[in-house]
């Protein structure tokens, strides 16, 4: 089963990114043919700062590798290192009705949030379709807000296949209903947009500050506490097995500990869980040439597949 996912280099990763998506990708490496790329072309729709994009791309590569992405098990590359995706993007554009793109929810949402209404943003789903179809992707893991983009890729693929024969594999969106929705420090869904994150690779000082900002109720220290509705508990249980969760629940129900104690405990859990990943992340960032070698290794494998696919398409077009 060939699975593909693209990840934008949009800044620091938080534990919501990890438990909501990255952990599932790492686990999937053992049973699927994983294709993962850092979507730096896509990131240009929100920022055209070249130096920032370059640094964020390297940080993203270091982050994913340190969290368990294995370049020997997965094909892992930088989107812009496989130029064929832009060639396919242009070909697919000829098969994409304007009305199909005008119905895209994400375009309207992003413009409403202040992003410039550029052609790049408008045609974002066509580039995403090129990412998917270039590699004969079967499964695309997505959040519910991205299902429509995979459906657009299918629509375009069907149109091309009707014209030229079975050129493209029809992809399917996979929404994992069991994926954790991680609450942020304010109790809403954890998101950079809400400024309520607990970042994985932040300094210990910043981590402590973020955890200290978790919103709690005013229950007195000596009184029993409601673990089910406590944001600290909701986050802590992600790091605990069943027995660990039960032990923490008992501490809540017993009373005698304040929320400050539970925040300190959560701080210890997060630090311990990501200790090795942080060390590896910092080591990788100190060796940008090594990071580039890893990305080049993946790009070479991805490019070979992409070139074979494009050769078939060139023959159909007459190029």
Language model features with spans:
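Short, polar/flexible loop-turn hinges at active-site or ligand-entry regions and domain interfaces
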Residues: 49-50, 139-143, 222
């Amino acid at each position: 089963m060939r699975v593909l996912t693209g990840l934008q280099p949009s800044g620091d990763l938080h534990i919501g990114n990890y438990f909501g998506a990255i952990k599932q990708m790492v686990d999937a490496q053992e049973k699927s043919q994983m294709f993962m790329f850092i979507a730096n072309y896509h990131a240009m729709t929100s920022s055209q700062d070249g130096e920032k994009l370059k640094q964020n791309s390297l940080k993203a590569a270091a982050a994913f590798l340190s969290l368990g992405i294995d370049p020997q098990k997965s094909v892992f590359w930088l989107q812009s290192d496989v130029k064929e995706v832009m060639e396919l993007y242009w070909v697919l554009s000829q098969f994409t009705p304007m009305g199909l793109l005008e119905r895209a929810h994400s375009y309207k949402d992003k413009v409403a949030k202040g992003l410039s209404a550029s052609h790049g943003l408008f045609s974002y789903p066509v580039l995403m379709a090129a990412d998917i179809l270039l590699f004969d992707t079967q499964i695309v893991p997505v959040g519910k807000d991205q299902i429509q983009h995979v459906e657009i890729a299918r629509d375009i693929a069907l149109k091309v296949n009707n014209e030229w024969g079975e050129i493209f594999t029809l992809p399917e969106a996979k929404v994992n209903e069991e994926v954790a929705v991680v609450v942020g420090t304010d109790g809403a869904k954890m998101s950079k947009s809400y400024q309520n994150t607990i970042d994985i690779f932040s300094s210990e000082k910043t981590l402590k500050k973020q955890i200290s900002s978790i919103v709690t109720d005013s229950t007195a220290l000596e009184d029993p506490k409601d673990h089910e509705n406590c944001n600290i508990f909701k986050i802590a249980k992600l790091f605990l097995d069943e027995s660990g969760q039960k032990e923490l629940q008992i501490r809540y129900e017993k009373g005698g500990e304040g929320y400050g104690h539970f925040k300190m405990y959560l701080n210890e859990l997060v630090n311990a869980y990501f200790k090795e990943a942080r060390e590896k992340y910092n080591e990788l960032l100190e060796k940008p040439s090594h990071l580039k070698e890893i990305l080049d290794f993946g790009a070479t494998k991805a490019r070979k597949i992409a070139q074979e696919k494009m050769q078939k398409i060139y023959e159909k077009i007459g190029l």
